[in-house]
Regions:
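Helix-to-loop junction immediately C-terminal to a conserved catalytic motif
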Residues: 49
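Conserved ABC ATPase "signature" region
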Residues: 109-127
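Conserved ABC ATPase signature
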Residues: 131-135, 139
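Catalytic Walker B motif of ABC-type/P-loop ATPase nucleotide-binding domains
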Residues: 156-159
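H-loop/switch region of ABC-family ATPase nucleotide-binding domains
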Residues: 191-192
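ABC ATPase nucleotide-binding domains
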Residues: 223-248
Length: 248
């Protein structure tokens, strides 16, 4: 569970990026945070992950031990950045996924167990010895997710996870996200392009100019998106029910 109260963040140049955000994210929830570029989405994610310190307000995080992770010691939260290359530090796929659990100080047998589990879950076992620079965009995104999973977080943050991916890669990453949600992980996804994921989320939160404007079930939120510079999904524009990108 994540409880955010009266959250403010100012950058050194004076930009007031977040203005009094109040938001509660339940355990096991799949939450979509959407907003136009510059709305404050990424700032909020970096505050939740602990990369930034809020100017005012608080973030309280409570997370039980996940039962599907193969080890006990791990951080509560993992974040998959928009630019997957910024998270890749190893020469090969296996080395990169090993980096996190090794830095947690896990014994070698636990590192191997965690890495093998994450590689298997993300479908990377067959290319575990492949140099990272030879990976496709979709493979790099899956590698970034595997690197986070190997540390066993209960809560996973995805910042614009479909950015710069082609259609097959988007579908592949989306499938893995759905699997993680089904396994009980709490997922928080930010994007300005809601089309790809909205059919699968539990709730949608809209951020505009640093303020939380609305939050609720997807079907209630689609009619509010356009007034905040967010393109509604095609199914809503056509008056249809929610349609998954995995259909067809």
């Amino acid at each position: 569970m994540i409880e955010i109260k009266n959250l403010h963040h100012r950058y050194p140049d004076g930009t007031h990026a977040l203005k009094g955000i109040d938001l509660r994210i339940s355990q096991g929830e799949f939450l979509l945070i959407c907003g136009s570029n510059g709305s404050g989405k990424t700032t909020l994610m970096r505050l939740i992950s602990g990369l930034f310190t809020p100017t005012n307000g608080s973030i309280r995080i409570a997370s039980p031990t996940a039962t599907d992770a193969p080890h006990g010691a791990r951080p509560f939260i993992g974040m998959v950045f928009q630019d997957a290359d910024s998270q890749i530090v190893g020469e090969t796929v296996r080395e990169d996924v090993s980096f996190g659990p090794e830095n947690l100080g896990l014994p070698p047998d636990k590192v191997a167990e965690s890495v093998n589990w994450a590689l298997r879950l993300m479908g990377l076992e067959a290319i575990s010895e492949k140099p990272c620079y030879l990976l496709s965009g979709g493979e790099k995104r899956r590698l970034a997710i595997a690197g986070v999973l190997a540390m066993g977080p209960d809560i996973i943050l995805f910042d614009e996870p479909f950015s710069h991916l082609d259609y097959p890669a988007i579908r592949e990453v989306l499938r893995h996200m759905i699997t993680l949600h089904q396994k009980g992980h709490t997922l928080v996804v930010t994007t300005h392009d809601v089309e790809k994921v909205i059919a699968h989320v539990d709730r949608v939160a809209i951020i505009h100019q640093g303020e939380l404007k609305a939050a609720g079930p997807p079907d209630d939120m689609v009619t509010k998106l356009s007034r905040f510079g967010i393109r509604p999904p095609c199914y809503a524009l056509l008056g249809q029910e929610r349609i998954s990108w995995l259909n067809g």
